Amino acid sequence: TIDDGFSSFYENAWPILKKNKIPFILFVNTREVGTFNYMNWQQIIELHKEDFVEIGNHSHSHEYLVDETSNVIKDDIVKSIEIFKNKLGYNSKFFSYPFGEYSLEFKKIIKELGFKYAFGQHSGVIDETKDYFEIPRFPINEKYGDLKRFQTLIKTLPLKYISILPKEKYLSLTNNPPIVKVKFFKDVKNINQINCYSNEGNVWRKSKINFINELNIQIILEEKFISERGRINCSIRVNGGFWRWLGIQFVIAEK
């Protein structure tokens, strides 16, 4: 997946992806299309004609919508849907949350507007048990895009879970830090070997884990999340140098 639709993607990555017919989703925020450093609609339509390319919706404004009211969120997304229909003749079934930030209310709006899948920016691997409106992705960019990291990421496997609490990933001042609990499926092996790290207190550190039973853990956060996004990454090493990986992202309310 590629977010934003920058012209640098069209100039550098598109020729390689096209030559090798590598399938991908390009998420575009409709307000920026055709402006400086962004692809135009002619280029987007060129990609859309290929059967291995999907064009996804990335909102209209790409603002911090999760902090806005329901009406503001809905108006922004509806505007992008109208532009999609005008330019491409349809609205995409794929959505990418701006900055990977979402709340239960944001998810509800996306479902009501007819989307089938929504992507965040919390790290992890897709599998059939995931919530289709909280699909994980590993960021690959100029800051997190070196080859060594990429080689690690392509050796990750899903860490399957039944549930993560709290369901609400949008934190207020009163529930930060959150009480984080994960319930795994019975076929997940070596839960006792799991390691989790978080950026609580704005410093990445290893988190303490309370093993409630063989399927349930509590990730203990001793300090509040300070940065705008609170992150937890958990992994279990498996044979062959692979890792089972689970990422959780929280959004910290401005007020």
Q: What do these predicted ranges mean?
A:
Residues T1, G5:
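Substrate-binding cleft of extracellular glycoside hydrolase catalytic domains
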Residues F6-F106, K116, T129-P139:
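Metal-dependent polysaccharide deacetylase catalytic core of the NodB/CE4 family, i.e.
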Residues S7-E11, P15-Q42, I140-K255:
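Terminal accessory/targeting
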Residues F115-G124:
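Acidic, His- and aromatic-enriched active-site or binding-groove loops in soluble protein domains
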